[in-house]
A protein has these predicted regions:
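N-terminal export signals
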Residues: 23-48
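Hydrophobic membrane-targeting alpha-helices
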Residues: 35-44, 97, 158, 367
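Protein kinase glycine-rich loop
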Residues: 73-120
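Surface-exposed binding/hinge segments that line
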Residues: 167-216, 239
Length: 596
């Protein structure tokens, strides 16, 4: 579709001759997805669509207790330290951003009164600023008023290097200006096509200045609020047992009418995905189970129990294997996997190419994930306009052997290939979870046929995905050769998702392993393309830049994509719970209710 045709269609929407839904459908047909189509209309001055979800309760409270299960247990309740998705989810019970992404990919205001727009004079056409108008009358859970000062403080808190906030990248290249007590202006250092980043979604959760001010910078980890949140959300904090249980109660002063529906909320952590699915779908002990990474065959069997249903939310999640570019077995200045080292064998491109051929993605899809994951060669799989057509995957043990032979990796007496005294022996870690252990087994079996020794390691999920900087077994530490997990894409734009390969995002001791570049891969070419995409306002040119980034990562075998995974949840039969594939599951927790 040419630019002229696109502009004509947008004009038809603005004139009321073409419905927003029909426009979105046409964009999807040519490789765009709902979130990007919505952003395009918004940039053209068309208002966001009304959410499709209908909230039926006519008063707040009265819904009893909502019992939810997260088999990866939360370990902290501070959104700007929440490396793991499960910690972000727990924070959404109590904290809120200015806006969130709903399941239909609409940007919905929550602490803001409206979404910025060109027509409203709150969005710059040159991409250099955006104005957010804040709700008035909103109170923190302790009764203090929510104002622009809290937004400015959150920005200052996140960008302070001593804080080591995982959200820092969203706030780094902007300045926040206070217009009045309920209006802020974000001034960007350069044209910013994706302005809905800071203060939006999980990275946008706003902190109360009056409670966190004494704990800025290097004191940030000492704040009582890290474990006992005081937010503006629908539920007030009651109790937290890290790695086990989060409890909240209704916020009777909540700023949205007739919400929330439930009187109390419980977020139980631990166990495994299968037991979580069973507790909702078969026994009905719980109302909601998060992130059901369970074989599809088992899910279908559990659904037959009649107590609940499986929900699938399309998004950009990718189950992938990471290859460590550094040496996890050598310590430098008190840290392993230091960027001052390089991996002794994975630094050989031939070895990485061979490993890429030894991952049987088709079998993983067919025998493990089914409708909950499809095989892919790409790291960036959504929105559709950003999917590369230049990559492909192949499972070929013979070709892997040929590559290793040609590169001089000879089999030793034990069958393991070696060269210059270095063996192809790798520790391959992931979280304890049946599909992941089956995935590990499939990879291990193929690797052994190519003379590569694989030692599998399975870490308790609550430990592996912990945000604890002192825990050496977390995935950001990456103290093994290979590791696997699902990384989510919690927003419609790939900018944040793809910054996890930027050199300035390297996870290290210096930033308390809060950096998003877990593989420690560094590429000047990638950095340059990413910087270009940050300021490119033409959506077509920008899409091409993200495709180039994906292709660089895949060509260098920095990661091995396995399956693209939508979000999968278990919901009790009567629970109405909008879940977005572009935000946290609990982003709309205020709208959840139980039908009579």
């Amino acid at each position: 579709m040419q630019e002229r045709e696109l502009r004509a269609l947008i004009a038809q929407v603005k004139d009321g001759k073409l419905s927003r839904r029909d426009f979105v459908r046409r964009m999807v047909a040519v490789g765009l997805t709902a979130p990007m189509a919505g952003l395009m209309l918004n940039h053209a001055g068309v208002a966001w669509a009304q959410a499709a979800f209908t909230y039926k309760p006519t008063k707040a409270g009265g819904g009893g207790s909502l019992k939810t299960l997260l088999w990866q247990a939360p370990t902290l309740l501070q959104p700007h330290f929440a490396v793991g998705t499960k910690d972000q989810e727990a924070c959404r019970l109590f904290y809120e951003p200015l806006a969130y992404w709903d399941p239909e990919a609409n940007l919905v205001p929550i602490l803001a009164t409206e979404v910025p727009s060109y027509e409203g004079g709150t969005l710059a056409k040159d991409g250099l600023w955006v104005v957010w108008k804040l709700k008035q009358g909103v109170k923190w859970h302790d009764g203090k008023p929510f104002t622009a000062d809290d937004c400015i403080f959150t920005w200052q808190y996140a960008v302070d290097p001593a804080t080591a906030a995982v959200s820092s990248g969203s706030y780094r290249d902007l300045k926040v200006e206070k217009i009045d007590d309920h209006t802020i202006k974000l001034n960007f250092a350069k044209p910013t096509p994706y302005w809905a980043d800071a203060f939006v979604g999980w990275k946008g959760m706003i902190l109360p200045q009056h409670l966190f001010e004494p704990y800025k910078g290097d004191k940030s980890r000492d704040a009582p609020g890290n474990l006992a949140p005081v937010g503006t959300g629908p539920y007030k904090f009651v109790d937290f047992k890290p790695g086990d249980l989060v409890r909240g109660e209704i916020n009777k002063d909540y700023h949205v009418a007739n919400r929330p529906h439930f009187d109390t909320i419980e977020m139980k952590g631990g166990g495994d995905a299968v037991s979580a699915a069973r507790a909702v779908l078969q026994t009905g002990e719980y109302d909601y189970a998060w992130n059901l990474q369970v074989e599809d065959e088992i899910l279908k069997r559990l659904e037959a129990g009649g107590k609940g249903r499986v929900g699938i939310s399309p998004g950009g999640g990718i189950e992938h294997i990471q290859l460590n570019t550094t040496d996890p077995w050598t310590e430098v200045d008190g840290e392993r996997s230091s960027v001052k080292t390089k991996h002794p064998t994975l630094s050989d491109k031939a070895v990485r190419d061979a490993l890429n051929l030894l991952v049987d993605r088709a079998s993983v899809e067919k025998f493990i994930y089914g409708r909950t994951g499809y095989a892919t060669a790409n790291f960036l799989n959504n929105p559709a306009r950003f999917i590369s057509k230049d990559t492909h995957y192949e499972f070929n043990i013979d070709k892997a052997n040929q590559i290793l032979d040609a590169a001089g990796w000879k089999r030793g007496s034990d069958g393991i290939r070696e060269k210059d005294g270095k063996k192809l022996h790798y520790v391959y870690q992931t979280s304890i979870n049946a599909p992941r252990q089956k995935n590990q087994a499939i990879v291990k079996q193929a690797c052994e046929k190519a003379g590569i020794s694989i030692e599998v390691k399975a870490v308790t999920a609550s430990v592996y995905f912990s945000s604890d900087a002192g825990n050496p077994d977390t995935y950001p530490h990456f103290y093994t050769d290979l590791q696997m997990y699902n990384t989510t894409m919690p927003e419609a734009d790939p900018a944040f998702f793809m910054n996890q390969f930027c050199s300035w995002e390297v996870a290290a001791k210096a930033n308390k392993w809060q950096g998003r570049n877990i593989t420690r891969w560094r590429s000047q070419a990638y950095d340059d393309i990413y910087r270009a995409a940050e300021k490119e306002l033409d959506p077509v040119k920008r899409a091409a830049l993200f495709i180039k980034m994906n292709d660089l990562v895949i060509a260098d075998v920095v990661v091995i994509p396995v399956v693209a995974r939508p979000k999968v949840q278990g919901l009790a039969s009567k629970l109405q719970a909008p879940v977005s594939g572009w935000d946290n599951d609990f982003a709309q927790i205020a709208d959840w209710y139980r039908e009579a």
